[in-house]
């Protein structure tokens, strides 16, 4: 059998017009209640079915196809007041309608199903096997919550599924339990305006996933291991100084105020999230700073690292969650080496971390946009090595040390129109460099991340400018003191 279903922009499904409502007939008062019908279908089977679903309600229509549909239900009693558990099995291929794909996703369900009756809604307990289901086909349903376009994402899951819907007034809601392995593969996401590559990866494997949710209970999520392979991320600081990844999910719009007084809704219980070791394999990050003029971009490649287990749980009330061990290695701009290590917790609120980073032999000329903004000169040649240590306390207090080694630094001519202080930076470089042309600078930095005026990069460059000023004036101060000036 083949079925084509469509929902128009007004939300009406065309199948609703297939059946005419039964005429209302008066029931004679006999004084006796009619015996309810009892129907039992021992075995119902459907083979080789297909379903086409088109939905015009979202701004971008949804087009989904299901074929090779095989369904078997046993002990079906549709009129029973108390529904039995019915053995059910389903196999199907699922594809995104309108796209050419040789191998669509596959879905297999094998378990028991119970139909709604009384206060009990639909319930299902089964083994579920989903292979490369086209999640991107459903993107129009949540597109209004995302500041990105999901071009492709294939979702897989293998494990158990238990779900039930309660219709009772005392504890209504959905109960869901998952236990198995999940994957999100071949993800491709672009920014909306302008359309630029934003995120992609070959494989995100989530092994040993356990998820439980129930009415009036906290959401619990536990993962044994996570592996992200062959991934890319574009990180952009926009002209207003915002980082693009912070705004990928739009905040929920507030509900319209009600004129009717209502009892406050109970506060949602905080979730319990526990994540095992995370591995990052063969990553690449393209960093673009559009806050600086001219713009600056850097390409980080061969990024491989690991993060140990972490959670949002606290040992005692008021105590921050424990930090996880971090290690990350890679290359910057193809030649410089990058090594990051330390401790952090992505789930900690507020943010807390203690990390160290080492960069060796980064070519300096690409950093000219920063030197033009803060020193007024472009960079002709030189290499940069950096040892940094950053520690952020739960109260937002930052303590950082920055050891900066500049090797064979050479500035060009002053850039016309630069608003940076007009300092003789070439003289300062000559005074700061040793006999081998190496400048070694140590810049401690501290401040509060809760201060909206606190910006780390400009602060470091201002410190360098101040250091240049001191380097220039120091020899003359020494000469003046020698002659009693």
Which residues fall in each region the model found?
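Secondary-structure transition motifs
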Residues: 1-71, 148-152, 173-174, 189-305, ...
């Amino acid at each position: 059998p083949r079925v084509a279903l469509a929902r128009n922009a007004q939300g009406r499904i065309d199948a609703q017009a297939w059946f005419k409502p039964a005429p209302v007939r008066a029931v004679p008062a006999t004084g006796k209640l009619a015996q309810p019908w009892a129907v039992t279908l021992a075995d119902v089977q459907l083979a080789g079915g297909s379903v086409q679903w088109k939905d015009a309600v979202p701004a971008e229509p949804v087009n989904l196809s299901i074929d090779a549909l095989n369904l078997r239900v046993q002990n079906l009693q549709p009129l029973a007041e108390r529904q039995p558990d019915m053995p059910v099995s389903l196999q199907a291929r699922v594809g995104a309608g309108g796209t050419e794909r040789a191998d669509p996703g596959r879905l297999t369900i094998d378990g028991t199903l119970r139909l709604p009756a009384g206060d009990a809604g639909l319930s299902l307990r089964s083994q579920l096997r989903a292979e490369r289901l086209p999640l991107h086909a459903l993107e129009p349903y949540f597109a209004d919550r995302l500041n990105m376009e999901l071009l492709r994402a294939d979702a897989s899951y293998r494990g158990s599924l238990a779900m039930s819907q309660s219709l009772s007034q005392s504890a209504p809601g959905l109960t869901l339990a998952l236990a198995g392995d999940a994957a999100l593969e071949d993800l491709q996401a672009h920014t909306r305006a302008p359309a630029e590559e934003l995120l992609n990866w070959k494989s995100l494997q989530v092994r040993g996933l356990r998820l439980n949710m129930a009415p009036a209970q906290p959401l619990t999520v536990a993962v044994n291991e996570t592996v992200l392979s062959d991934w890319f991320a574009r990180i952009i600081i926009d002209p207003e100084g915002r980082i693009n990844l912070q705004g990928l999910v739009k905040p929920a719009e507030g509900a319209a105020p009600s004129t009717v007084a209502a009892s406050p809704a109970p506060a949602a219980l905080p979730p319990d999230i526990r994540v095992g070791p995370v591995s990052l394999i063969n990553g690449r990050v393209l960093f673009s700073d559009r806050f600086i003029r001219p713009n600056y971009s850097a390409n980080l490649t061969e990024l491989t690292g690991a993060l140990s287990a972490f959670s949002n749980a606290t040992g005692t009330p008021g105590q921050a969650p424990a930090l996880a061990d971090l290690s990350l290695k890679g290359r910057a701009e193809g030649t410089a080496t990058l090594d990051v290590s330390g401790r952090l917790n992505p789930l900690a609120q507020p943010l807390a971390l203690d990390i160290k980073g080492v960069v060796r032999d980064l070519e300096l000329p690409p950093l000219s946009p920063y030197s033009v903004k803060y020193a007024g000169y472009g960079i002709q040649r030189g290499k940069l090595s950096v040892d940094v240590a950053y520690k952020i306390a739960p109260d937002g207090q930052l303590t950082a040390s920055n050891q900066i080694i500049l090797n064979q630094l050479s500035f060009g001519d002053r850039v016309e129109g630069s608003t940076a202080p007009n300092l003789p930076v070439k003289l300062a470089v000559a005074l700061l460099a040793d006999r081998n042309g190496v400048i070694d600078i140590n810049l401690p930095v501290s401040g509060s991340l809760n201060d909206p005026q606190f910006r780390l990069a400009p602060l470091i460059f201002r410190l360098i400018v101040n250091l240049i000023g001191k380097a220039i004036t120091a020899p003359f101060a020494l000469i003046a003191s020698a002659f009693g000036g």
